[in-house]
Structures are given as structure tokens and as C-alpha cells.
Amino acid sequence: MLPKNPIIGLCQQASFLISAAKVDQCPEDSGLEVAFAGRSNAGKSSALNTLTHASLARTSKTPGRTQLLNFFRLDDERRLVDLPGYGYAKVPIPLKQHWQKHLEAYLGSRESLCGLVLMMDIRHPLTEFDRMMLDWSVASGMPLHILLTKADKLAFGAAKNALLKVRQEIRKQWGEGISIQLFSAPKRMGVEEAQMVLAGWLDLLPQEDEESAEEA
């Protein structure tokens, strides 16, 4: 049984901080930030809301609705960041290019960024966007944790097989340092496991618990 996670209390008092269209509009680059990324329609906003027990991120039936860097305050030193969704076919190409430019600027310059949570639809994993984020994570040494979202859409055995297959592919191409798990927002599957990863990155766990979270 996992110990009570200190991030839960912080999330209960989480609040919207600011939206930024580009890097120079972001909050002061201090403290610790964890960013959430995912291709449009991968369930990113639903996952963020479920992990924080709050309706922080805007959800919509239209993928790509989140077009800004959205910052949420946990306390004076810790933030969560909802990054723009990418890849939705109906989004105009110039807007897609704007998103990519400023996402790359954020990822490349943000000193407070301490971890990246990447959402992949379990039925359509390892898209071009996902591979780009994996490449960047390995090249930059940024800790990355993958949520295979919408795991409830598959039978349990099929979901486990998908997890094993994706894990093997990631280890083959990107090495052993990337963690991955099943996740379902409606069923709250994998919530505690993901919260432990967040707490470790945000320096909220005793050393021994942090090491356990990293091994998950």
C-alpha cells in the first residue's frame, strides 16, 4: 500500500495562476514545475484534473482547445503546467506552428521544469509527437513519465499487453530511464502511482519514498 501522498493536500488548494502565449509571459522562473504534454485527444486535461482532484484544466469535446501554456499554483515554490495539445487536424497550420515554436522555447529554456508527464492514448501510442517528446527528454536529461491514458477502453489483459509492448519499444529506442504506467481518468486507474511520481519530482517525499517512486 502506497503511503499518503503530500501532494494531495497541495492539489486541494491548487489554483489557476496565469496563461501564457509565449515564454516571456510565463511566471518567474523559480521553484519547481511539472509539465503535462500530450497529443490532442489523448486525455491530457482529464488526466490533469483527475490527478489534482480539481477542475483545473479545461476539458472539451473539441481536441486542441487548450492553446496556451496554463500554469497552476500548488504553493509558492511549486507549479503544474498544462501544455498545448498538438496534432488535431482541424487546427490551422499557422496556429500549429505557433504552438510548436513556443512549446520548444518553453522546454528549452525553463530552469524550473523538473519533470514531464506525457499522455498517450493507449490505443494509439508512440505518435510522431510522442516520439519527438521522448527524443527531447533523453537529449536534455529531463525526467519523463508516461501515462497510457484511456486504459479502460481496453480489456484488462489487452491493456497490460499494450503496456508491455510500449515499454519494450521505449526501452529499445530510448533506454531504461523513462517510466510508464496504465491510466484511466474515469476509473481513477493509476492515480496514486502517478501522484507519487509528481511528489518525487516536486521534492515532497522523504528520500526513500522518492527512490521508490522513481522505480515505479
From Swiss-Prot:
GO BP, one annotated term: division septum assembly
Q: List residues binding GTP.
A: 38-45, 64-68, 82-85, 149-152, 182-185
Q: Which UniProt keywords apply?
A: Cell cycle, Cell division, GTP-binding, Magnesium, Metal-binding, Nucleotide-binding, Septation
Cofactor dependency: Mg(2+)
From what superkingdom does this record's organism come?
Answer: Bacteria
**Gene3D superfamilies per the UniProt record, alphabetical:** P-loop containing nucleotide triphosphate hydrolases
Instruction: List cellular component terms (GO).
Output: cytosol
Which residues take part in binding Mg(2+)?
S45, T66
The record's section on Pfam families has: MMR_HSR1 (PF01926)
**Molecular function via GO:** GTP binding; metal ion binding
| Residue ranges of every copy of the EngB-type G domain listed in the record | 30-204
Q: Which family does it belong to?
A: Belongs to the TRAFAC class TrmE-Era-EngA-EngB-Septin-like GTPase superfamily. EngB GTPase family.
Q: What does this protein do?
A: Necessary for normal cell division and for the maintenance of normal septation.
Protein name (Swiss-Prot/TrEMBL): Probable GTP-binding protein EngB
Q: State the organism of origin.
A: Ectopseudomonas mendocina (strain ymp) (Pseudomonas mendocina)
* Classification of source organism: Bacteria, Pseudomonadati, Pseudomonadota, Gammaproteobacteria, Pseudomonadales
* Gene that encodes it: engB
